[in-house]
Amino acid sequence: MKINLEELKFGTELIKRGFAKMQKGGVIMDVTNAEQAAIAEEAGAVAVMALHKVPADIRAAGGVARMADPKKIQEIIDAVTIPVMAKCRIGHIAEARALEALGVDMIDESEVLTPADVFFHIDKRKFVVPFVCGARSLGEAVRRIWEGAAMIRTKGEAGTGNVVEAVKHMRLINRAIFELQKMNEERIYGVAEKYASRYAELASRVREEMGLESVSRNDVVFEEYTLGEIIDGIYEILLEIRELGRLPVVNFAAGGVATPADAALMMQLGADGVFVGSGIFKSSNPPEYAKAIVEAVQHYDEPEVVAEVSKGLGEAMKGLDVFKLSEDERLQTRGL
């Protein structure tokens, strides 16, 4: 008897998460053209992320950062045999649908681009293509997983070449999971209520302005979901995290990884893989940096290998001191 995965309760979710797990232990590299994509594939990247500018250039250019030109994305798809991902703006359903129609293998609903919606992220369960999303905390990660994200990545601080924020976000998530494992069901439900409250912000603001009563569990607050349904869904995810001792989806490091040692550090902190944005193609020797970072991820627990692949690479990308960035300059604050 042939099984139709679409008819199973978690059929498409299994497919999406399965694709994401296939990238585990690998490096996903940002590329802006077919030539860079070929360099990434040659170096051993498990996938490439197609975008119009690397994060460092997006940060420098300012203005509104949008989805890349579909023609450019198609050229990258045609140039490589590895999976091709692409970024859409937070909450921009139309960009995501366009990318899905284009045939990308995964969509990154990314804070690196200018957000399109300040209230909601995309309901990713309504798409066939899997999504990856950034997170600074367990709350952000769980909300994205509830929405259907098949992969989580640290936000870090993209385009800085400074790994400190990625380290912070990984440690915050790991510590929250540690705390969760000590909680009983009642306390976990309280955490779920707190995490779910972000979905009620639009309805709460409108009701307050109109002088109406506050939002209740039975009120629809996001798409067709009531606040109570969201709380219950997040509660189930938290129980799963408590049982597993980790997120139920793969969790990659991203945002500021610039050297082989940076990549190895994030793997040592528990990352399942690494995204490298500006670190490769803003370095003095992109092909060699790409190969070295792949080697460092594969051998993150072998310091002698990390040291060897780091020799003679030339200058890493110029970095920024994230502590000198204003709140408006911090890309990680985008999203909810």
Swiss-Prot record:
GO MF, one annotated term: pyridoxal 5'-phosphate synthase (glutamine hydrolysing) activity
Pathway participation: Cofactor biosynthesis; pyridoxal 5'-phosphate biosynthesis
Residues that bind D-glyceraldehyde 3-phosphate: R171
Active site, renumbered: K87
SUPFAM superfamilies referenced in this protein's UniProt entry, alphabetically: Ribulose-phoshate binding barrel (SSF51366)
Record keywords: Lyase, Pyridoxal phosphate, Schiff base
Function text: Catalyzes the formation of pyridoxal 5'-phosphate from ribose 5-phosphate (RBP), glyceraldehyde 3-phosphate (G3P) and ammonia. The ammonia is provided by the PdxT subunit. Can also use ribulose 5-phosphate and dihydroxyacetone phosphate as substrates, resulting from enzyme-catalyzed isomerization of RBP and G3P, respectively.
Protein name: Pyridoxal 5'-phosphate synthase subunit PdxS
The organism of origin for this protein: Archaeoglobus fulgidus (strain ATCC 49558 / DSM 4304 / JCM 9628 / NBRC 100126 / VC-16)
Organism lineage string: Archaea, Methanobacteriati, Methanobacteriota, Archaeoglobi, Archaeoglobales
Gene name tied to this protein: pdxS
